[in-house]
A protein has these predicted regions:
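N-terminal Rossmann NAD(P)H-binding glycine-rich loop of SDR-like oxidoreductase domains
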Residues: 11, 19
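Conserved NAD(P)H cofactor-binding loop of Rossmann-fold oxidoreductase domains
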Residues: 84-90
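Substrate-binding pocket helix/loop in short-chain dehydrogenase/reductase
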Residues: 92-93, 100-105
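Active-site helix of classical SDR
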Residues: 116, 152
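Alpha-helical segment proximal to the catalytic Tyr-Lys
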Residues: 121, 164-169, 218
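Residue(s) in the substrate-gating loop at a strand-loop-helix junction
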Residues: 136
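C-terminal substrate-recognition "lid" of short-chain dehydrogenase/reductases
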Residues: 203-227
Length: 231
């Protein structure tokens, strides 16, 4: 059985770019999305890895996460986890309702916690590996208008730091990338040209992620790396 790179949140624009980038390097990828099979994952057969596994799971459900990882265990030893699950909604502290707050914390932070916990339990026994989480520029510079989202992403960064410290004795690296605005079809549809002027293509971020989970990045752990360009 070959080493796997697990990509959670693989159906989104960034997820598809990451899966395609890894597949382009002929790596074995377990692409996880909420609903599977997803025909959008690596649509070009020329970029298909030797083994591309399409898996489905509700990553906000701890029991379903454990079921997912039991399935992954049958596919091979995990070399790296790329955790891209998340979502955005605006709102100030004073006008964010309970449902929106809980949804953003669950989608951005809780999913990351459960998936990282399952991965860490396995990687710590291997003596090698990598975990890559996705934070946000707003986690460092929380401006007005995205309160719950910024708090959730700040939690992702702190979780990344804690895991990096906990897994250091096992030589498992844990890092995060910090996007700003990503140039995706959804953002193009909802944002004006001015807001998109400095947007970064998902393919560019995918190349950074691919490097960070590779053995070439072995000296890097506990880092929060900006990938928002000049925007």
């Amino acid at each position: 059985m070959a080493d796997l790179i697990v990509v959670c949140g693989a159906a989104g624009a960034l997820g598809q770019a990451v899966v395609a980038e890894l597949a382009g390097h002929r790596l074995d990828v377990a692409a996880v999305a909420r609903h599977q099979p997803d025909p959008n994952l690596v649509p070009d057969p020329t970029t298909t890895s030797p083994l591309l596994h399409r898996l489905g799971a509700d990553l906000s459900d701890p029991e379903d996460v454990e079921r997912l990882w039991a399935e992954i265990d049958e596919l091979g030893q995990v070399a790296a986890l790329v955790n891209l699950v998340g979502g955005f909604a605006g709102g100030a502290v004073t006008n964010t309702d309970v449902t929106t707050y809980r949804s953003l914390i669950e989608l951005n932070l809780s999913t990351t916690w459960w998936v990282c916990r399952a991965a860490a339990r396995r990687l710590s026994g291997q003596g090698r590996g990598a975990i890559l989480n996705v934070g946000s520029r707003t986690a460092l510079h929380g401006g007005a208008g995205a309160a719950a989202y910024a708090v959730a992403k700040a939690g992702v960064l702190k979780l990344t730091e804690v895991l990096a410290a906990e897994l250091a004795p096992s030589h498992v690296r844990v890092n995060a990338v910090l996007p700003g605005v990503i140039d995706t079809p959804a953002n193009r549809a909802s944002m004006g040209k001015t807001a998109l002027a400095g947007a970064v293509p998902p393919e560019a971020i995918a190349k950074v992620i691919s490097f960070l989970v590779s053995e070439q990045a072995w000296p890097i752990s506990g880092a929060a790396i900006p990938v928002y360009g000049w925007g």
